[in-house]
Design a protein with these regions (language model features):
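Eukaryotic intrinsically disordered, low-complexity regulatory linkers and tails enriched in Ser/Thr/Pro
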Residues: 1-142, 151-287
Length: 287
């Protein structure tokens, strides 16, 4: 087996032999438990979190690999990462360290357009998609659409995602997921459109406010293929500033409620926050 070096990707640490190009949950478990050739590509990391180099993640909480590993991530730079933590923990790490504040805004945008807010995590031209909604118990498989070229649903019982070419020789991985949602194609199309709109807002904001031109990774991924988009109702805002103004009160209340929950015994905080909220709004809107 070998590893390839490609501009922008560095060393690809996943196995590249043809027999290791196709993956599913069943194949992943069987190979890790029985194929000694994979050992050199396996890493153990209970603190692993989703990142832009993650291709896909399979959840094994109900049937742990080797009796203890509850999640497996395919990472271009790290290789095949096994964790005793669930995919819930991997996703929570991303939420805490990368997109926690940003999630408030993008979820509000998603609600405006009628998108299921618990089906994916959108960053700037980076899209983590949950094969089953991650609300509730959070235990679900993930596919990272910014590395995906195309996908198809096979007989309504399996969805197969094909990656973009990852090196000059056309290295492609295929990830299969069982029991996809009946309307999976529509949901993904909505999220792709949502990502397109949100990323464009972000690009314009960075250009106008900071004079920065941010570039997208993987311009040949499905994120930039409008043929897959499912058009949503037009958003009611066309800039981050208008978005902030539109949702200011909601975000402020959410922030204050979070603080109050952290200090439950201090009931007087409810009164104090109510007072300061009114003052802040007066100052902001010159009331």
């Amino acid at each position: 087996m070998s590893a390839y070096k490609q501009r922008n990707l560095g060393i690809i640490s996943l196995p590249t032999d043809i027999k290791y190009r196709n993956w599913s949950k069943e194949l992943t478990k069987r190979r890790i438990e029985n194929d000694s050739q994979l050992e050199q590509y396996i890493k153990y990391d209970n603190k692993y979190q989703l990142n832009k180099n993650t291709l896909a993640v399979y959840e094994f909480k109900q049937n742990p690999i080797l009796g203890k590993y509850k999640a497996v991530a395919f990472d271009l730079n790290r290789g095949i990462v096994l964790s005793q933590k669930s995919t819930h923990a991997m996703m929570q790490g991303l939420m805490r360290h990368a997109v926690h504040c940003d999630m408030i805004w993008q979820r509000m945008l998603a609600r405006e357009a009628g998108v299921d807010i618990y089906q994916g995590i959108v960053m700037y031209n980076v899209l983590y998609f949950s094969m089953h909604a991650f609300s509730g118990n959070f235990f679900t498989d993930w596919i990272c659409l910014h590395w995906i070229k195309d996908f198809h649903v096979k007989r309504h019982d399996q969805a197969i995602f094909n990656s973009i070419a990852l090196d000059k020789n056309g290295l492609v991985y295929n990830f299969a997921f069982d029991s996809p949602k009946p309307n999976l194609t529509k949901i993904i199309g909505q999220y792709l459109f949502h990502n397109h709109y949100y990323s464009d807002l972000y690009y314009q904001h960075m250009l106008q406010e900071n004079n920065l031109r941010v570039t997208a990774i993987n311009s040949d991924s499905i994120l930039h293929n409008s043929n897959y988009y499912v058009q949503l109702d037009l958003y009611a805002v066309d800039s981050f500033k208008k978005l902030a103004d539109k949702f200011y009160n909601h975000v402020l209340n959410l922030h204050l409620l979070t603080i109050v929950k952290e200090f439950k015994p201090l009931d007087y905080l409810h009164r104090e926050h109510h007072f300061f909220t009114k003052q802040i709004i007066k100052i902001r809107y010159n009331r």
